[in-house]
Every structure is written in structure tokens, then in C-alpha cells.
UniProtKB/Swiss-Prot annotation:
Family indicated by similarity: Belongs to the LAMTOR3 family.
Name of the protein in question: Ragulator complex protein LAMTOR3 homolog
InterPro entries per the UniProt record, alphabetical: LAMTOR3
Domain of life according to the entry: Eukaryota
Function of the protein: Regulator of the TOR pathway, a signaling cascade that promotes cell growth in response to growth factors, energy levels, and amino acids. May activate the TOR signaling cascade in response to amino acids.
The protein's assembly and partners: Part of the Ragulator complex.
GO molecular function: kinase activator activity
Source organism: Dictyostelium discoideum
Gene Ontology terms: cellular component: Ragulator complex
One of the protein's GO biological processes: positive regulation of MAPK cascade
Length: 132
């Protein structure tokens, strides 16, 4: 768990904090089990994200990938008071929760960097699971 929290802190500071403030991050598996999270103090993200929302994203991205337009990498959800960006890589889902004033284009523009980081973390998690 400590490795995951360090990873989330790295993402928040080095990739997202350049341009996006008031951001919470939740890392989970495809079933919605939360592996780690960093909740911004001014955010109510902890109350919003639950396992069912994350696992629903997993199902929705599988269905979206069936549209014959290639694999779906992310889904953006706009709500009245927040934006949630889910990014899926190798059975690991990163949920980015931010306020409605945030620039989603900047988040999606960081997607390649996030995917590279998620891929290495996912491989590390898979390795840890196999060692158990």
C-alpha cells in the first residue's frame, strides 16, 4: 500500500499539479477494490467515489471498447460540482476527481505520461501478487 501511495503522490506532484489544482486521485483494480487514494482536503471526493462507481467504469469501458473504434483508455464524467476522469491500464484504474473549473484537456494531455506510469505500477502490483 505504501508503494501505491508514493506513486499517487508522484503523479499528483509531477504530472498533474503543474496545471490542475484541487485534485484527488484514487487507484483501484477492475473490481473496484481501492488500492490507494489521495484525497484533496477541499474535496468531497471521498464521499463521492465508492467501489460501485469504479467497478461500473470498468464495465462501461469494456462496452465502449466493443464499438469497433479500438480499446477505450479513458472515460470523462461531468457532474454538477465535479469532473471525474477514469484511466484504465492493465486492470488498474486511476480515477482523477477535480472541480468543474479544471481543464480536462490538460488532464487528457497528460494521459500518455499517466499510462506509462500506470503500466510500470501495474506490472509491479502483478509481480507482488504472484509472489504471495
Amino acid at each position: 500500500m505504501e508503494k501505491v501511495d508514493e506513486f499517487l503522490e508522484y503523479i499528483k506532484v509531477s504530472i498533474l499539479d503543474k496545471s490542475i489544482v484541487d485534485t484527488s486521485l484514487i487507484l483501484s483494480d477492475r473490481d473496484g477494490f481501492v488500492l490507494g487514494k489521495i484525497i484533496d482536503k477541499s474535496s468531497s471526493a471521498d464521499n463521492v467515489i465508492d467501489n460501485s462507481l469504479i467497478s461500473t467504469f470498468s464495465s462501461a469501458t469494456d462496452q465502449a471498447s466493443k464499438l469497433h473504434a479500438g480499446n477505450n483508455k479513458s472515460i470523462v464524467s461531468f457532474f454538477e460540482d465535479r469532473i471525474i476522469v477514469h484511466i484504465n491500464v492493465s486492470n488498474v484504474i486511476l480515477s482523477i476527481i477535480t472541480d468543474t473549473e479544471s481543464n480536462v484537456g490538460l488532464i487528457l494531455g497528460s494521459q500518455d505520461d499517466l499510462i506509462r506510469s500506470l503500466t510500470s505500477l501495474s506490472n509491479s502490483i502483478q509481480s507482488d501478487i504472484q509472489d504471495m
